Amino acid sequence: MKKITGQVKLQIPAGKANPAPPIGPALGQQGVNIMEFCKQFNAKTQAEAKEALIIPVVITVYADRSFTFILKTPPAAVLIKKAAGLHTEKKKGSGAKKPGKEKVGQITRAQLEEIAKKKIQDTTAASLEACMSTIAGTARSMGIDVVG
C-alpha cells in the first residue's frame, strides 16, 4: 500500500482542466505531474463538458508523486440552476439577491427528484425523500420555487 502524502479538493469545469490557477499551484505544491492530471481529468469529464458543469474532484497524492482522483457529482446549486434554466457559470451570479423576498425561477418536483437521484451518492441523506428535502432547501435559499 502506498503512503498518502496529501489530498487536494478542487471544483473544476468539466473538460476544462489546465495548468493555470487554481489547479497548477494546488497540485504543484504536492509534486504532482499537472499536465498528466489535466489530461486524465479532461478525458473522464468529456461527457459533462457539453453541459458546462462544474465537477468537484478529490485528488489523493502518494509519496512516490503518483496520484488518484475521484470525481463527485456537480454541486446541487449548479444542478438547480441548470434545471431552472439559469446561467451556470460562477461569474454570472444567477441566484436571487434577496432569497426570502425575490424569486428568480422555479423547478418541478420531477426535476427535484432527478437532481436528488444524482446527488444521493455524495450526501449523507438516509433516503431519496431526505435528499430531496435538502435540495429543496438549497433551491429556496437561492430564490427558486419548487412547484408540483
Curated annotation (Swiss-Prot):
Q: Which SUPFAM superfamilies match?
A: Ribosomal L11/L12e N-terminal domain (SSF54747), Ribosomal protein L11, C-terminal domain (SSF46906)
One GO biological-process annotation of the entry reads: translation
Post-translationally, this protein is described as follows, namely:
One or more lysine residues are methylated.
The keyword Ribosomal protein is annotated on this UniProt entry: yes
Disulfide bond sites: none
Q: Which GO terms describe its molecular function?
A: large ribosomal subunit rRNA binding; structural constituent of ribosome
Q: Which SMART domains match?
A: RL11
Q: Protease: is it a keyword of this entry?
A: no
**Gene Ontology annotations for the cellular component aspect, listed alphabetically:** cytosolic large ribosomal subunit
Q: What keywords would UniProt list here? A: Methylation, Ribonucleoprotein, Ribosomal protein, RNA-binding, rRNA-binding
Q: Would you identify the family this protein belongs to, as annotated?
A: Belongs to the universal ribosomal protein uL11 family.
Q: What does this protein do?
A: Forms part of the ribosomal stalk which helps the ribosome interact with GTP-bound translation factors.
Q: How does it assemble?
A: Part of the ribosomal stalk of the 50S ribosomal subunit. Interacts with L10 and the large rRNA to form the base of the stalk. L10 forms an elongated spine to which L12 dimers bind in a sequential fashion forming a multimeric L10(L12)X complex.
Protein name, as recorded: Large ribosomal subunit protein uL11
User: What organism is recorded for this protein?
Assistant: Myxococcus xanthus (strain DK1622)
Query: What taxonomic lineage is listed for the species of origin?
Result: Bacteria, Pseudomonadati, Myxococcota, Myxococcia, Myxococcales
* Name of the coding gene: rplK
